[in-house]
Structures are given as C-alpha cells and as structure tokens.
Curated annotation (Swiss-Prot):
An example Gene Ontology molecular-function term: G protein-coupled receptor activity
Database matches in CDD domains: 7tm_TAS2R14-like
Gene: Tas2r117
Parts of the chain that traverse the membrane: 17-37, 54-74, 96-116, 136-156, 191-211, 240-260, 270-290
Glycosylation: residue positions: N76, N169
Family: Belongs to the G-protein coupled receptor T2R family.
Protein name: Taste receptor type 2 member 117
Extracellular side: 1-16, 75-95, 157-190, 261-269
Pfam families documented for this protein: TAS2R
Principal subcellular localization: membrane
Length: 330
C-alpha cells in the first residue's frame, strides 16, 4: 500500500509539473503577443493610448513574473542541496514581491480606468476624477510604489528577525523548518498589502454594477428596444472585471493554502500544486484581455487561422502515412 501511494505521488507530481510548464509557456506567449501588438501599433502611429500603455506594462510585468517563477522552480528542484543564506532569501522574496506587486496593481489600474471611462454618475467628485483619468492612474501607481517600498522593508525586517532568532542555534544557512515558518510570515504580510488593491478593485466593480443599473433604469423610461452602446460597454467591462476577480481569488487561495498548511512546503508535490494554482492568474487573465480587446482579437485571428491550417496539414499527413503503412502490410 505504501508503494502504491508513492507511485501515485510521483504520477501526480509529474502531471502537475507538465501542467505548470504548459501554463508558463502559454502565459509567456500570451503576454508577449500583447506587448508585440501594442509596440507595433505604437511604432506605426507614433503614439500609444493610456489603455494600451497599461496593457503593455501589465504584460511586461507578467512576463517578468512568469520568468522569475520558472527560474525559482529550476533552482529549487535542480539544486535541492543548495545552501541559502539570509541575504539570498531576502533577494528572492524582494524579487517575488516586486513581480506580484506590479502585476496586481497594474491590473487594478486597468479596472479603475475601465470604471472611469465607462461609468456615468452626476457626482461632481466622480466627474472631477473622470476628466483627470491619467492623473488618477498616475497617483494610484505612486501610492502603490510607496506600499511596495513599505512591503519590502517589512519583509526584510521579518527575515532579519528570524535570522537573529535562529542564528544562536544553527548556522547562517536556512533549515527547511526555518524557511517554511519564515515563508508563512512573509505570505501573511503580503496578504495584508494585497488587500489594498482588492478593496479598490471591488469598489470599482460594485460602482460599475450600480452605474449599469441606473443607466438601464434610465433607458427603460425613455427608450424601448435592445441595448445601447453604453450598456454594451458596461457589460464588457463587467465581464473583464469579473474574470479578473475570479482569477485573482484563485491566486489569493494559493497564498492562503500556503499560510494554512505551511509545514507542507517541505514537500515538492504541495509546492508544485500551489504554483499551478498561482500561475493561473497571470496566464489566463492575459487571454481574457486579448478576447475582450478588438485590436488584439483581430491581430490574433491570422495566427489562429495559421495554427488551424498547420493542424489540418499534420492530420492529413498522419492519415496519409497511416494509409501507406496499411498498404505496405497488405
């Protein structure tokens, strides 16, 4: 029975590793495609809209995030006996926090931008923000930078505190028990800072719903028939924000699981599972943005046609080869 569970564990880890690699590849391809399309459009038109600037920055941050995760996984699984000092751990945490921070905050700026562009309120403060949407995005990013600096400082203080506590009993290198407990504390700290963009995104989401409801109620009183352009824009923005929240919830869930069962961080199967769940957010959210953007969708269409033609050609060649083998047998 013990042998059976060992085989099952190996199969599960191999399956999750394949899923993880596939997620990494398609995530880098999707985000790289967005950067390429927007940069080509920028070279062609000599200018880039605010939405495209945010989408490009978001894609670049997620490419960095996915590449960083890939390097981290290679180091963890290829060099299991590698001795890590407290300074190395701090560098790893700072890079991880930096990648997550920009990926989440730029996505939050995108939801704020959608809200200010599409929502319709007669409130004077809202109109003030709506007319100064670029400044709102700039201030949001500036606040996020201040929070990033504070997050990194507190994380470094946390790792230094654990180092000083355990330095009396063990060497300067990190034991697996120490690393798991330190990782749990860092994740708790990270969750606290992640709550700020969550609250901001949730607020814009609820206000978008309220704006859609008031607009729909107003339209029912004056116009009979299908949706107007503003209602359609509301629905598209809501679909994008809902998809963002679902994937973001999965990301938060992966972090909470690591906090709840931090002692399992010593097991490779649990680590790979958490990474598979964690990567779903930066990978699949990029494809949702591609589907929701007309320019990206149109640019992606020729690639889909080429891929379909390649698949058809491969299937035809496979059938021809199979038929040739049957003829040779008979």
């Amino acid at each position: 029975m013990k042998h059976f569970w060992k085989i099952l564990s190996v199969i599960s880890q191999s399956t999750l590793s394949v899923i993880l690699i596939v997620e990494l590849v398609i995530g880098i391809i999707g985000n790289g495609f967005m950067v390429l399309v927007h940069c080509m459009d920028w070279v062609k038109k000599k200018k880039m809209s605010l939405v495209n600037q945010i989408l490009t920055a978001l894609s670049i941050s997620r490419i960095f995030q996915l590449c960083l995760l890939f390097i981290s996984l290679v180091i963890n699984f290829s060099y299991t006996d590698l001795t890590t000092s407290s300074r190395m751990i701090q560098v790893m945490y700072n890079a991880w926090i930096l990648a997550n921070h920009f990926s989440i905050w730029i996505a939050t700026c995108l939801t704020v931008l959608y809200f200010l562009k599409i929502a319709n309120f007669s409130n004077s403060f809202f109109l003030y923000l709506k007319w100064r949407v670029e400044k709102v995005v700039s201030v949001t990013l500036l606040v996020s930078l201040l929070l990033l600096i504070l997050n990194i400082l507190l994380t470094n203080l946390e790792t230094d505190m654990w180092t000083n506590e355990y330095q009396r009993n063990i060497s300067c290198s990190f034991s697996s028990h120490y690393y798991a407990k330190c990782h749990r504390q860092v994740l708790r700290l990270h969750i606290i800072f992640l709550s700020v963009p969550v609250v901001l995104s949730l607020s814009t989401f609820l206000l978008l719903i309220f704006s859609l409801w008031t607009h729909h109620k107003r339209m029912q009183q004056h116009v009979q028939g299908g949706r107007d352009a503003r209602t359609t824009a509301h629905f598209k923005a809501l679909q994008t924000v809902i998809a963002f929240f679902l994937l973001y919830s999965i990301f938060i869930l992966s972090v909470l699981i690591q906090i709840w069962k931090y002692e399992l961080l010593k097991k490779n199967l649990f680590v790979v599972f958490c990474e598979v769940v964690y990567i779903a957010f930066p990978t699949f959210h990029s494809y949702i943005l591609i589907v929701g953007d007309m320019k990206l969708r149109q640019a992606c269409l020729p690639l889909c046609i080429i891929a379909a033609e390649i698949q058809t050609t491969l299937c035809r060649n496979f059938r021809s080869l199979k038929y040739f083998r049957l003829c040779c047998i008979f």
